[in-house]
């Protein structure tokens, strides 16, 4: 008996909708990363993009535990002298909640070219409405 190897044509992609209202940022990001990579499937293969599409709604209503709103910092640098910028998580959640969720999920995805393909299947929206409601095989996840 030979070992079954997954081919790119064998992969079937579903759509998962995750409602982030009232849920913790890390919990939502971990669930999204699991579905994006395909680790929930019995045919998981590390060298192929076998994951599903993930839609995260209500990004504005996400919560964090502890004092992270005031203490967790996000850093960036423009590359120019004096171009170092830092922002608190609380400020970013008010202005760019989509970036916060995408950044958290990106940290849980492999850092290679396959990771870029995987991350392209993530869709994040501030409100409850999203344009992917008509996709076939939409699976609603609520934890």
Curated annotation (Swiss-Prot):
PROSITE patterns for this protein: RIBOSOMAL_L13 (PS00783)
CDD domains for this protein: Ribosomal_L13
InterPro entries: Ribosomal_uL13, Ribosomal_uL13_bac-type, Ribosomal_uL13_CS, Ribosomal_uL13_sf
Top-rank taxon, per record: Bacteria
Keywords: Ribonucleoprotein, Ribosomal protein
GO molecular function list: mRNA binding; structural constituent of ribosome
Gene Ontology BP, a term: translation
Any one cellular-component term (Gene Ontology): cytosolic large ribosomal subunit
Pfam family, one: Ribosomal_L13
Subunit structure and binding partners: Part of the 50S ribosomal subunit.
Family classification: Belongs to the universal ribosomal protein uL13 family.
PANTHER family associated with the record: LARGE RIBOSOMAL SUBUNIT PROTEIN UL13M (PTHR11545:SF2), RIBOSOMAL PROTEIN L13 (PTHR11545)
Its job: This protein is one of the early assembly proteins of the 50S ribosomal subunit, although it is not seen to bind rRNA by itself. It is important during the early stages of 50S assembly.
Name of the protein this chain belongs to: Large ribosomal subunit protein uL13
Source species of the chain: Dehalococcoides mccartyi (strain CBDB1)
């Amino acid at each position: 008996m030979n070992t079954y190897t997954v081919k790119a044509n064998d992969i079937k992609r579903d759509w998962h909708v995750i409602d982030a209202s009232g849920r913790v940022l890390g919990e939502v990001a971990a669930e999204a990363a699991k579905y994006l990579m395909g680790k929930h499937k019995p045919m998981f293969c590390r060298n192929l993009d076998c994951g599903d599409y993930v839609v995260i709604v209500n990004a504005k209503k996400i919560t964090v535990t502890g004092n992270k709103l005031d203490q967790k910092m996000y850093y960036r640098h423009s590359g120019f002298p004096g171009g170092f910028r830092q922002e608190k998580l609380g400020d970013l959640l008010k202005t760019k909640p989509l970036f916060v969720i995408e950044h958290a999920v990106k940290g849980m995805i492999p850092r290679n070219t396959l990771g870029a393909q995987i991350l392209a299947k993530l869709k994040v929206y501030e409100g409850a409405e999203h344009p992917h409601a008509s996709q076939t095989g939409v699976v609603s996840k609520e934890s």
